[in-house]
Amino acid sequence: MGKKKSDTASGGAIPEGDNEKGKKIFKQRCEQCHVVNSLQTKTGPTLNGVIGRQSGQVAGFDYSAANKNKGVVWDRQTLFDYLADPKKYIPGTKMVFAGLKKADERADLIKFIEVEAAKKPSA
């Protein structure tokens, strides 16, 4: 009721997610390597504009061959699957993040990324 869901690859559903909870998760688990509100890269590539972008395509970022060659286009479903276990989803990725096992946490993080990454970057 009231929560929109998307189908998952396993036939389940992706919870809609909570932007504020996602913001907290981003600050705790992602912000040390990624930004969403600018085009700069850190240890990881910017996530600004990530929805709809193909993996390994941020100009100036040194991706692993695995990430460049995966050819996935990031959307709610692909991010949901990737964030569960990045090294399983893209074997050979340089990303050291172990993943988020809880579906609700992944959905919250994705909601935050959807909202923030769609905004015009600061620089």
From Swiss-Prot:
It comes from the Eukaryota. Binds 1 heme c group covalently per subunit. GO terms for cellular component: mitochondrial intermembrane space. Its main location: mitochondrion. It is found in: Mitochondrion intermembrane space. Residues 1-21 are annotated as: Disordered. Heme c binds at C30, C33, H34, M95. One of its GO terms (molecular function) is electron transfer activity. Keywords: Electron transport, Heme, Iron, Metal-binding, Mitochondrion, Respiratory chain, Transport. SUPFAM superfamilies: Cytochrome c. InterPro entries: Cyt_c-like_dom, Cyt_c-like_dom_sf, Cyt_c_1A/1B. The keyword Iron applies. Electron carrier protein. The oxidized form of the cytochrome c heme group can accept an electron from the heme group of the cytochrome c1 subunit of cytochrome reductase. Cytochrome c then transfers this electron to the cytochrome oxidase complex, the final protein carrier in the mitochondrial electron-transport chain. Belongs to the cytochrome c family. This is Probable cytochrome c 2.2. The gene is cyc-2.2.
